[in-house]
Structure formats: structure tokens, C-alpha cells
Regions:
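FAD-dependent oxidoreductase catalytic-site/capping-region signature
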Residues: 51-58, 68-264, 272-277
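Glycine-rich loop(s) and the adjacent beta-strand/alpha-helix scaffold that form part
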Residues: 1-70, 79-80
């Protein structure tokens, strides 16, 4: 059921942190402190620029054009709707000596409003800065013992100062990249966070309000040895201490991967399904 749904189901079933389940009036089946803990994601921050040429997707998002794009895709599987519009992605190291790419930069030929998620009404583009291996950890908690109540998702983005420092470094790297001559005929004014937003304090103020998710939540029922009190499943996805129960999704990852979670989740499902079947 995913990194949110799987710990939710386990805790409702009495498998999870003893004190938390008791506070929700749920009978304990197995005291498992790691259920719902260790939540990881790839935090995301968007830098937006005016585009000096009329080459963005903004005109195609107007009502009639968007209807036409939908019809085109239904008939031909081509056109604007055939792309996710992250046409260029770079996985980079934030500096010398960094062991693995710890930043993901994605450029999109349109800029969106952070609140409404509607396109800005001008030719503009945005660059996403994503953290690939965070130090901050969140958690999933029950809101009640009613299965229809959604759980609490506490992501704790940038709580660890190392994540905040890395995000600021990513913003500076994007600005350095966009200042290269190859972008001179495209890059206009920085719309957000703005050319005057340079100090750590100013950037942190923007990060606090505008850091969002890449929707790569994982690691809330992590795989590990039975001797690890925070491990939930073994290397076959079997829940420790429970017979005939497995979890097979992104929640069992011990650490979030250095990239999108879709392909690794498919790999996990393919691998464990061979054992089940």
C-alpha cells in the first residue's frame, strides 16, 4: 500500500510502536517500534525564470489548446500530453569529494504557481532542485483507530541543517548553470526566489515556505535483520514476528535511492513476487 498506506495498515492491525498503538486504543499484536518511522523523501524546490523566447508550453495550456492536446493524445498518443515535460535531468555531485550524486536538477518548459499549481501566465520555465539522500527523517502516525481516517504524515523536510545547506548549494549551482552563455538567449529575470534573494537567511525563509515533495516517499517499514529493533521486514519482505504476512512496496527500502523510486519499487515487486509465486 506504499510508504504511507503500509504502516497505516500495520498499525491499525496492532503491529507497530506499543505506546502509540495504546494511545489510539488499539490492541497490541507485535511491538514493532520501526513501523511508520524512518520516513524519507526527495524534497524539491523550484527556481523560476522568465523566458526571452516564446518557446515555452504556456500558450498550449490555455483552455482550447489544452483540449486539443488531449484529443491529439487520445487519437495519436503524440503531442504535449505524451511527455512529462521534464525533458532534461541532471544527477550531479554538489562538490569535489562527494561520493555519489546528491542533487537532481530537472528543467521544465513551463513555470507553475506554488499554491494553485496553475501555469504562470507568461513565457517562463523552472528548474527543480531535488535532494537525493537526505539526513532528515519523518514518520507516519495514526490519527485515530478509524481505518477511514488518513494518517498523519510528518515529513520533517530540511530539519537536519545538512539538508538545508545542500538545498542552498543546489540553488547556487542552478544560478551558476543558468548564467552560462548557452542560456543567454533564453534566461530572463529570475521570478522566484528572485535575484535579490541571495543570503542564507533569505534563502532559508523561502525554503521554509516553498519546499515541496517529489512524491518519492519511502522507508517506513524498512528491511533489516531481526536483531535490529527498527527493522520491520526481512530480505523477503516478511514481517518480523508474523506468519504469512509480507510488505512489498517502497516502504521496505532501508534508504531512499539516489533517484526516482518507481523503477526500484518495480524491481522489489518483481524480485519478491518470484518467491511468493
Amino acid at each position: 500500500a506504499g510508504a504511507v498506506g503500509s504502516p497505516h495498515i500495520l498499525m491499525l492491525s496492532g503491529i507497530g510502536p506499543k505506546d502509540h498503538l495504546k494511545s489510539m486504543g488499539i490492541n497490541l499484536v507485535v511491538d514493532m517500534p520501526g513501523v511508520g518511522q524512518n520516513l524519507q523523501d526527495h524534497p524539491d524546490f523550484m527556481i523560476k525564470y522568465k523566458c526571452l523566447k516564446p518557446v515555452t508550453l504556456w500558450p498550449k495550456t490555455k483552455r482550447l489548446n489544452s483540449i486539443g492536446a488531449g484529443v491529439q493524445w487520445l487519437l495519436t498518443k503524440e503531442g504535449m500530453c505524451a511527455s512529462n515535460h521534464f525533458d532534461s535531468v541532471a544527477c550531479i555531485r554538489s562538490g569535489p569529494g562527494v561520493e555519489y550524486p546528491d542533487l537532481q536538477l530537472c528543467i521544465s518548459p513551463i513555470a507553475m504557481d506554488d499554491n494553485s499549481w496553475q501555469p504562470l501566465k507568461e513565457h517562463a520555465f523552472q528548474v527543480h532542485v531535488g535532494l537525493m539522500r537526505t539526513h532528515s527523517r519523518g514518520k507516519i502516525e495514526l490519527r485515530s483507530n478509524n481505518p477511514t481516517d488518513p494518517p498523519r504524515i510528518l515529513v520533517n523536510y530540511l530539519k537536519d541543517k545538512r539538508d538545508r545547506e545542500l538545498m542552498r548549494k543546489g540553488i547556487h549551482l542552478v544560478r551558476e548553470l543558468l548564467d552560462q552563455p548557452s542560456f543567454s538567449d533564453l534566461k530572463g529575470e529570475e521570478i522566484f526566489p528572485g535575484d535579490n534573494c541571495k543570503s542564507d537567511a533569505d534563502l532559508d525563509a523561502k525554503l521554509n515556505l516553498h519546499t515541496t515533495s517529489q512524491w518519492h516517499l519511502a522507508c517506513t517499514a524498512r528491511m533489516g535483520l531481526k536483531t535490529d529493533k527498527y527493522a520491520v521486514v526481512d530480505n523477503s519482505g516478511k514481517v518480523h514476528g508474523i506468519t504469512s504476512l509480507r510488505v512489498v512496496d517502497a516502504s521496505i527500502m532501508p534508504f531512499a535511492p539516489n533517484g526516482n523510486t518507481n523503477a526500484p519499487t518495480i524491481m522489489i515487486a518483481e524480485k519478491i513476487s518470484d518467491e511468493i509465486l
